[in-house]
């Protein structure tokens, strides 16, 4: 370890860049190497519990705790819209608990670092790193993989948080151009269903998928392009439901005028692509930031959030899911529905921002150049 550090310390650095959400360690290394210009680049959102390290109390904001968001939070007075509601008070309490737990984890990390240096003496002449909280505060900018126009209404604007969501979409170009017209032999309505590459079947079991396919078959004017690793019922209408276990050309499908709906886990990359494409969503999250982002979709009015109710036997309540999905799909397939109108307006706003301020990649590189003076 000493030899590695000695080699690293002889190099010249302009800046250090890493992701803080899950790996604080690199920022301690940056400090030990004397790197003052540090940047945090997150593949996800800016976590609400990290606001406390910027001096912002998330409990005072109408923002759901990362894992606490549920369907309906933004649809009635029993949810987060009403600051007198039980749900609002519960969310505030959970935000407080999450804040304290993160602070506790950081303090334990600090103690571990202290013990490591003083009890084991694994690196000579190297001072103990600053606390994790201080390392976070030293970060010049936090770049997050989220569009600026796709965040909760009360999520605070901070000069330290820069939104570069869409950087890959803009480089690919297909979703920032005019929508592609469908050919005469193509269906007037295409529905895309895919739950990403990590867990292609999401949190579904066979019964819940069968319920979903039953609803698909009620809309015979549409073609449903489905990726579910062939984890499907034995009998279904293959004329309107195309199932594959291969990765679908998601951007290309979303770019078409006849694509009316995206049924997704609503991970950040899929959500961003849907927004740039102007395609409304039915969100059925499974893990990670998907619950938080599904709630965001609901608040923005660009889709519907359905949560799978899992029993103690690890089975989905297929009857409840079937009813929820039927209601959501029927709403989405109404001509000129409000979700389509709202996401069209959001797409227009994002593309106008791109035209006026330039690609996110340029903004990202320009901001780093400004900090390092090059």
Where do the language-model regions lie?
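Extended hydrophobic-aromatic, low-complexity segments
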Residues: 203, 235-236, 271-276, 283, ...
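Nucleotide-sugar-dependent glycosyltransferase catalytic domains
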Residues: 1-221, 232-238, 312-313, 326-327, ...
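C-terminal "capping" alpha-helix adjacent to the active site of nucleotide-linked donor transferases
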Residues: 313-338
């Amino acid at each position: 370890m000493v030899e590695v550090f000695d080699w690293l310390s002889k190099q010249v650095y302009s800046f250090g860049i890493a992701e803080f959400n899950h790996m604080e360690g690199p920022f301690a290394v940056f400090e030990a190497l004397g790197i003052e210009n540090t940047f945090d680049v997150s593949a996800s959102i800016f976590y609400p519990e990290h606001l406390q390290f910027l001096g912002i109390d998330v409990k005072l904001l109408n923002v759901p705790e990362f894992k606490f968001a549920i369907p309906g939070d933004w649809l009635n007075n029993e949810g987060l819209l009403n600051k007198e509601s039980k749900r609002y008070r519960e969310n505030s309490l959970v935000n407080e608990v999450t804040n304290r737990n993160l602070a506790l984890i950081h303090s334990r990390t600090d103690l571990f670092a202290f013990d490591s240096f003083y009890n084991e003496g694994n690196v000579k002449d190297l001072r103990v790193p600053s606390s994790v909280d201080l390392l976070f505060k030293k970060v010049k900018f936090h770049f997050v993989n989220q569009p600026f126009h796709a965040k909760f209404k009360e999520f605070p604007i901070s000069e330290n948080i820069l939104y570069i969501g869409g950087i890959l979409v803009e480089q690919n170009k297909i979703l920032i151009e005019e929508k592609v017209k469908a050919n005469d032999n193509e269906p007037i309505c295409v529905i895309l269903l895919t739950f990403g590459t990590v867990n292609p079947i999401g949190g579904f079991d066979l019964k819940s998928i069968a319920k979903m396919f039953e609803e698909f078959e009620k809309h015979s004017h549409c073609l449903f392009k489905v990726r579910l690793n062939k984890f499907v019922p034995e009998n279904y209408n293959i004329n309107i439901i195309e199932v594959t276990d291969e990765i679908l050309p998601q951007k290309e499908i979303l770019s078409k005028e006849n694509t009316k709906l995206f049924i997704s886990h609503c991970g950040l990359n899929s959500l961003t692509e849907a927004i740039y494409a102007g395609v409304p969503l039915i969100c059925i999250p499974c893990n990670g930031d998907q619950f938080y982002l599904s709630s965001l979709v609901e608040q923005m009015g660009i889709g519907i959030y359905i949560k799978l109710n899992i029993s103690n036997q690890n089975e989905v309540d297929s009857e409840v899911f079937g009813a929820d999905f039927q209601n959501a799909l029927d709403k989405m397939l109404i001509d000129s529905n409000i979700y389509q109108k709202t996401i069209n307006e959001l797409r227009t706003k994002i593309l106008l921002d791109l035209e006026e301020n330039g690609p996110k990649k340029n903004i990202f590189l320009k901001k780093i150049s400004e900090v390092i003076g090059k």
